[in-house]
């Protein structure tokens, strides 16, 4: 492509030098999108059309196919600004040049891992003088109509913990771009995630309560399966009893999400990271610490959830009555029963969930993400389901011990046993399989929980004015 400089008058500005690529004598007086599509490579033209669709107001979207040249100039200006931001973010030494290591490090900070050889291959496609470094002039000439926002879009498209809610709040928080912080989009994403979690948990509450019953009562000599458990719940308290404990489970979403997000941002500052996003290991450390802080604060609500899920008809009048009863009969310490295994469970859950999700994400990006960072609904749901399932499988024994410790005083004939004592007791009387009681309903709720939370998240996000990119 030959480079051509034009001086084009743009509204409310002086004459602006606009540099773009001429393809086979591309004329300056283009009249229609059809003409442009003939002269430009299909990938570059589709990128321009996506940009145009995003920038147009709703009432202007049904246009007549005519291309306004002034509008095309604005596109080139916006594109060059995006390129400049990406170049500066990679040029950490402020040397005015970017090498293969800079590309590797920048992508690693975004959770995308490529080899030095792959980075050199990318570099060679832009390097015109064979120095294996590129300056700003070489960088901005790398096809003007290619999507410059591809790297930041990885963060925007691959949200994980904000979108998917499987009932366990142990995931590492998602990263937000500088743009999302400045525009206030971050809180819209969090509100959307909170609303999605509320709907998702409510829809899967019967399976969640069944899991708790199987974890606690499955050790009392009677085997409890899915159908017998559901039948027992309905027989004892009617259909409404299937949702016992769901109220407090939904209420705790807001404070826990807010605490985790604020703690995560503060920990990032303490860690002294100057980058927009953290690397995988840093995210794991910061996310785990944020999870510990949030869980420590709202843990009494976790105990209340378990007690309310196990309650019999007429035992408590509501959440406050249950809290008063526990405080009166067992004391304040009862609200932190099972705290240690719960905290220990954060590490395997958060670590494996993050590692699996990032591995799946990187695999997809390396194979299919060269042209577009948007993975599509199916890929996102599949990655979220697999990573959440792996995380829960690894931390499930600790979750079961936590639940039994929370329920000790509410189970007749149950003695107060420590975490290690309870582990030994389960292994002795039930064997290794005893550590996985209730796993079936827990896994059965993952796919519907992930699917429901994604659909509701997208709907609320759209209502709050967050457009899908």
From Swiss-Prot:
Gene3D superfamilies: EF-hand, Mitochondrial carrier domain. It is found in: Mitochondrion inner membrane. Ca(2+) binds at residues 64, 66, 71. InterPro entries: EF-hand-dom_pair (IPR011992), EF_hand_dom (IPR002048), GDC-like (IPR002167), Mit_carrier (IPR002067), Mitochondrial_sb/sol_carrier (IPR018108), Mt_carrier_dom_sf (IPR023395). One of its GO terms (biological process) is ADP transport. GO terms for cellular component: mitochondrial inner membrane. One of its GO terms (molecular function) is ATP transmembrane transporter activity. Residues 208-244, 302-337, 399-437 are mitochondrial matrix. The chain crosses the membrane at residues 190-207, 245-264, 288-301, 338-357, 381-398, 438-457. It is a multi-pass membrane protein. Residues 47-80, 78-113, 114-149 form the EF-hand domain. Residues 1-189, 265-287, 358-380, 458-469 are mitochondrial intermembrane. Solcar repeats lie at residues 184-270, 278-363, 375-463. Its main location: mitochondrion. Keywords: Calcium, Membrane, Metal-binding, Mitochondrion, Mitochondrion inner membrane, Repeat, Transmembrane, Transmembrane helix, Transport. Calcium-dependent mitochondrial solute carrier. Belongs to the mitochondrial carrier (TC 2.A.29) family. This is Calcium-binding mitochondrial carrier protein SCaMC-2-A. It comes from Danio rerio.
């Amino acid at each position: 492509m030959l480079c051509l400089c034009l001086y084009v008058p743009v509204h409310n500005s002086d004459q602006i030098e606009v540099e773009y690529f001429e393809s086979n004598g591309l004329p300056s007086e283009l009249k229609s999108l059809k003409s442009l599509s003939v002269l430009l490579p299909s990938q570059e033209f589709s990128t321009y059309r996506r940009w145009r669709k995003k920038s147009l107001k709703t009432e202007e979207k049904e246009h007549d196919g005519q291309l306004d040249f002034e509008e095309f100039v604005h596109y080139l200006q916006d594109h060059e600004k995006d390129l400049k931001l990406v170049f500066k973010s990679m040029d950490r030494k402020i040397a005015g040049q970017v090498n293969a290591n800079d590309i590797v490090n920048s992508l690693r900070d975004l959770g995308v891992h490529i080899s030095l050889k792959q980075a050199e291959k990318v570099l060679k496609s832009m390097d015109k003088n064979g120095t294996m470094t590129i300056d700003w002039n070489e960088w901005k000439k790398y096809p003007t109509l290619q999507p410059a926002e591809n790297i930041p879009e990885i963060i925007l498209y691959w949200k994980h913990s904000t979108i998917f809610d499987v009932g366990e709040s142990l995931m590492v928080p998602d990263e937000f771009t500088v743009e999302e912080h400045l525009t206030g989009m971050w809180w819209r994403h969090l509100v959307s995630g909170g609303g999605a979690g509320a709907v998702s948990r409510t829809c899967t509450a019967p399976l969640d309560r069944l899991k708790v019953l199987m974890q606690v009562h499955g050790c009392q000599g009677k085997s409890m399966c899915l159908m017998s458990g559901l039948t027992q719940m309905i027989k004892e308290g009617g259909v409404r009893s299937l949702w016992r404990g769901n109220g407090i489970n939904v209420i705790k979403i807001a404070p826990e999400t807010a605490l985790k997000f604020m703690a995560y941002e503060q920990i990032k500052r303490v860690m002294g990271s100057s980058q927009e996003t953290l690397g995988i290991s840093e995210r794991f450390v910061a996310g785990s610490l944020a999870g510990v802080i949030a869980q420590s604060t709202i843990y009494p609500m976790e105990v209340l959830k378990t007690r309310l899920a196990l309650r019999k008809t007429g035992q408590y009048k509501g959440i406050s009555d249950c809290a008063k009863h526990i405080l009166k009969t067992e004391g304040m310490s009862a609200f932190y029963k099972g705290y240690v295994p719960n905290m220990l469970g954060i590490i395997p859950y958060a670590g494996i969930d993050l590692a699996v999700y990032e591995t799946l994400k990187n695999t997809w990006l390396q194979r299919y993400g060269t042209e577009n960072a948007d993975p599509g609904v199916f890929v996102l749901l599949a990655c979220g389901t697999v990573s959440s399932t792996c995380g829960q499988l690894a931390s499930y024994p600790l979750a079961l011990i936590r639940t039994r410790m929370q329920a000790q005083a509410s189970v007749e004939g149950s003695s107060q046993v420590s975490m290690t004592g309870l582990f030994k007791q389960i292994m002795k009387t039930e064997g290794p399989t005893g550590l996985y009681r209730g796993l079936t309903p827990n896994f059965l709720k993952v796919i519907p929980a992930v699917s429901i939370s994604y659909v509701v998240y997208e709907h609320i996000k759209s209502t709050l004015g967050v457009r899908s990119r």
